[in-house]
């Protein structure tokens, strides 16, 4: 085939130039498969095949691709005919050597946007795959506008454009590149303080950190979210590499001249602050674009607390040439170029709402909103882009200045469950998809009908740094109330800090829940708050806030943190307590969810109850209790704790307990 001969010649040119390209095959299954095999036979290489189905020898499923990161391949196939895993697509592109093709298999071009996407099961909260027209239209726009990508469609003439030759590229030898060399000199002479190195993936951040460690006269300690991710750093650091996990380092009294934190944005900020304060010099490295999330928000929030921070950026790629067409296309397709906050939005702020259909009529506006949200939130990923474009129940507001987006708010519909399903969620018998806050209000609150109410949860909110402290965030929340009809409440779930809570409080939210363990992503306890919009919403917020006040002392003792509520010293078992205790004793409600009422039960009961008292009053570990009580493990311990709660309730009032048991047991029969 003349096409294959031309592609063979072009591949040799790409290798000389140090670039990679995308080749799209769009058509029926048999046609795509046949042409992929012809490409594989004509162009020697590894031909890694990413597909949910094992269609080839060198096969890997999209979900298992993370296990291959750090390795390199020549040529790969990404099968997106039944679903498009955007993060896997981006990750695959990062494994390809200079001179490689990424062959993207797509359905028939005209049918693609109406075809259900199996990947939507991961992010849409729908029981079945849904069509994703906005993402498909966006991807089509990017592909057809990209003169460097090759689009080969079934029943369409194939033509290979003439690509202007680029300058020859010479791969890195392992020695520091000029950009790295200059940065190393600055770091070597840096006075005590904190330095942050940011870069897109493949720029040599980890290599730079390792080279610094190998050159300094003193000692260095390396920490990172996972030791496995520091292999490159260790290779360049040589014998001076010493790794200690973040939590272990904090618990130790280790000292060193330098602390090097690889992928610092993935470490909880409170933990990172404590670590940085212990060492005279700290180097933080983090990724500012990519499939694992953006580190721009990390720079904004964390590094802003260090006024004399030394900031550096690596821009030159190491493993392929600058301006690689594949890297450029993936970045545009998955919107990796987040807002860099270099331009200040001018003029008065105007709040307006928009829906997902704007991706069709005016894609630039939602694109800018996504870039703002991505730049401000570290954990924004391609999954969020897909959800924003096509998941049901998504709503948006923008705060627009004269020339730029100054702020954005992303809301998600929640609640509206049937009475029977809400009761089953409360009892711990069911846990359907989605409805983060609505389900938590039922599963962790004391109202079995909480999830029947309709709410709208704040998924993301961001304001441009140059326009903060002007009330724009409050304006966005007020706009959400104005544009929202027939709902019971707005809700938010966030990693609790005093500063964040003051913002939500000023917006009118009522605190209704505090978690009982720190989240790994934030290092904070999860807090949930409601802004009532109906009488039913107001009653729910008041009831849950009252419960939080009653449980405040117990939670503070358990967490070691004072709650921002006025605590009530009330040891009398209420009707709500009785219902919740029965939910623990006779259903599947978690132990710590019922912490407050269980402690009140222990104060009221005269029974021994060793499994409950040992855990909640004496703070014995599960392992200690299992040994003492001769139980085989945690599951049996929890069974014993439920049995003890039932014994205590029957001893207090057997008739009432039996009535509650029968009532709650019925909720398990819901299908």
Give the positions of each predicted feature:
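N-terminal pre-P-loop "Q-motif" helix
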Residues: 2-10, 171-191
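N-terminal accessory nucleic-acid engagement/regulatory domains that precede
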Residues: 65-162
């Amino acid at each position: 085939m003349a096409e294959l001969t031309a592609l063979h010649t072009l591949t040799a040119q790409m290798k000389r130039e140090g670039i990679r390209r995308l080749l799209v095959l769009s058509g029926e299954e048999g046609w795509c498969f046949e042409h992929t095999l012809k490409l594989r036979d004509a162009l020697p290489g590894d031909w890694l095949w990413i597909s949910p189905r094992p269609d080839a020898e060198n096969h890997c499923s999209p979900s298992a691709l993370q296990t291959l990161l750090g390795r390199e391949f020549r040529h790969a196939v990404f099968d997106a005919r039944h679903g498009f895993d955007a993060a896997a697509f981006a990750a695959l592109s990062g494994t390809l050597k200079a001179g490689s093709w990424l062959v993207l298999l797509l359905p028939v071009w005209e049918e693609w946007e109406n075809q259900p996407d199996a990947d939507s099961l991961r992010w849409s909260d729908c029981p079945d795959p849904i069509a994703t027209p906005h993402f498909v239209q966006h991807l089509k726009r990017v592909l057809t506008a990209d003169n460097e990508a090759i689009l080969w469609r079934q029943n369409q003439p194939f033509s290979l454009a003439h690509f202007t030759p680029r300058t020859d590229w010479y791969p890195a030898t392992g020695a520091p590149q000029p950009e790295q060399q200059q940065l190393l000199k600055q770091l070597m002479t840096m006075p005590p303080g904190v330095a942050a190195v940011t870069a897109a993936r493949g720029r040599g951040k980890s290599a730079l950190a390792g080279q610094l460690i190998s050159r300094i006269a003193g000692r260095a300690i390396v920490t990172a979210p996972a030791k496995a991710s520091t292999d490159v750093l260790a290779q360049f650091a040589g014998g001076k590499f010493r790794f200690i996990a973040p939590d272990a380092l904090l618990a130790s009294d280790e000292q060193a001249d330098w602390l090097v934190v690889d992928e610092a944005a993935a470490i909880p900020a409170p933990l990172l602050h404590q670590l940085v304060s212990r060492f005279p010099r700290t180097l933080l490295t983090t990724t500012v674009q990519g499939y694992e999330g953006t580190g721009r928000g990390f720079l904004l929030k964390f590094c802003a607390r260090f006024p004399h921070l030394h900031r550096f950026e690596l821009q030159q790629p190491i493993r392929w040439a600058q301006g690689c067409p594949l890297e450029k296309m993936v970045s545009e397709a998955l919107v990796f170029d987040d807002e860099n906050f270099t331009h200040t939005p001018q003029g008065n702020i105007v709040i307006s709402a928009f829906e997902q259909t704007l991706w069709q009529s005016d894609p630039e506006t939602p694109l800018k909103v996504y870039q703002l949200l991505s730049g401000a939130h570290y954990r924004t990923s391609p999954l969020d882009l897909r959800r924003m474009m096509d998941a049901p129940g998504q709503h948006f507001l923008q705060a627009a200045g004269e020339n730029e987006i100054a702020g954005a708010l992303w809301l998600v519909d929640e609640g509206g469950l049937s009475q029977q399903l809400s009761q089953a969620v409360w009892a711990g018998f069911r846990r359907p998809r989605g409805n983060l806050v609505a389900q938590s209000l039922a599963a962790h609150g004391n109202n079995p009908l909480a999830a029947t109410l309709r709410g709208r949860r704040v998924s993301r909110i961001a304001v441009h740094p140059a326009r903060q402290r002007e009330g724009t965030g409050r304006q966005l929340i007020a706009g959400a109330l104005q544009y929202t009809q027939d709902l019971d409440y707005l809700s938010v779930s966030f990693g609790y800090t005093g500063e964040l809570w003051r913002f939500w409080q000023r917006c009118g939210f009522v605190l209704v829940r505090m978690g009982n363990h720190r989240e790994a992503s934030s290092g904070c306890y999860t807090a949930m708050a409601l802004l009532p919009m109906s009488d039913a919403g107001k009653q729910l917020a008041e009831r849950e806030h009252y419960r939080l006040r009653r449980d405040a002392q117990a939670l503070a003792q358990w967490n070691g943190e004072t709650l921002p509520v006025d605590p009530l010293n009330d040891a009398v078992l209420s009707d709500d307590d009785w219902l919740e205790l029965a939910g623990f004793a006779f259903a599947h409600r978690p132990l710590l969810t019922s912490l407050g009422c269980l402690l009140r039960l222990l104060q009221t009961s005269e029974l021994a109850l060793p499994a409950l008292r040992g855990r909640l009053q004496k703070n014995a570990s599960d392992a200690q209790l299992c040994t003492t009580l001769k139980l085989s493990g945690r599951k049996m311990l929890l069974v014993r704790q439920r049995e003890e709660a039932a014994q205590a309730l029957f001893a207090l009032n057997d008739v009432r307990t039996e009535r509650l048991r029968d009532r709650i047991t019925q909720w398990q029969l819901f299908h």
